[in-house]
A protein has these predicted regions:
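Short, charged, intrinsically disordered terminal tails
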Residues: 2, 137-144
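N-terminal leader segment of winged-helix/HTH proteins
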Residues: 1-31
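Charged, amphipathic alpha-helical coiled-coil/dimerization segments
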Residues: 21, 70-136
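DNA-binding alpha-helical recognition surfaces that contact promoter or target DNA
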Residues: 42, 67, 130
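Long, contiguous secondary-structure blocks with strong helical propensity
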Residues: 2, 56-75
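Short amphipathic alpha-helical segments with heptad-repeat character
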Residues: 10, 14, 18, 59, ...
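N-terminal helix-turn-helix DNA-binding core of bacterial DNA-binding proteins
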Residues: 22-64, 143-144
Length: 144
């Protein structure tokens, strides 16, 4: 048996992430959402934000946010509202239906996460997160 390499570890991370993403995506589709749209709803959960703020928070282009909002707005989950003092700015508001869908979709995503790491105890989960954060640092990102 050959010794494990860094490439083996990266392959395992990629495979695990891929499987979790597929399973999470399937669970979210039952709620009519994608992982990206769930992240957007979560970004609005703490209060109204501008399109620019959401774009920056999610690290996606303003055009992508516009497309995402169009879909979520069509389903009544998000509303565009004028800024009270700056008419050039559009605020995004999570509707009551959006809040309801956020709760259901978040619960579904949490079930997937719990199943994915359910074989690990709390200490192992902490170690896993710490290791992934250390791996992400050279890439200039955070695991959280």
């Amino acid at each position: 048996m050959r010794p494990a390499t860094g490439s083996d570890a990266v392959d395992a991370i990629i495979y695990a992430a891929h499987r979790i993403r597929i399973t999470t995506g399937a669970a979210l589709r039952e709620h009519g959402l994608s992982l990206s749209s769930l992240k957007l709803l979560r970004a609005l959960a703490d209060g109204d934000r501008s399109m620019r703020e959401v774009s920056q928070a999610l690290h996606v282009s303003p055009r992508t946010i516009t497309d995402m909002i169009d879909g979520l707005e069509a389903h009544g989950l998000v509303a565009r509202c004028p800024h009270p003092s700056d008419r050039r700015v559009t605020r995004l508001h999570l509707t009551q239906a959006g809040t309801h869908e956020l709760v259901g979709a978040s619960t579904a995503a949490e079930r997937v996460a719990a199943a994915a790491i359910g074989a690990l105890d709390q200490a192992e989960q902490h170690v896993l997160r710490s290791l992934l954060e250390r791996v992400c640092v050279p890439a200039g990102e955070s695991a959280g």
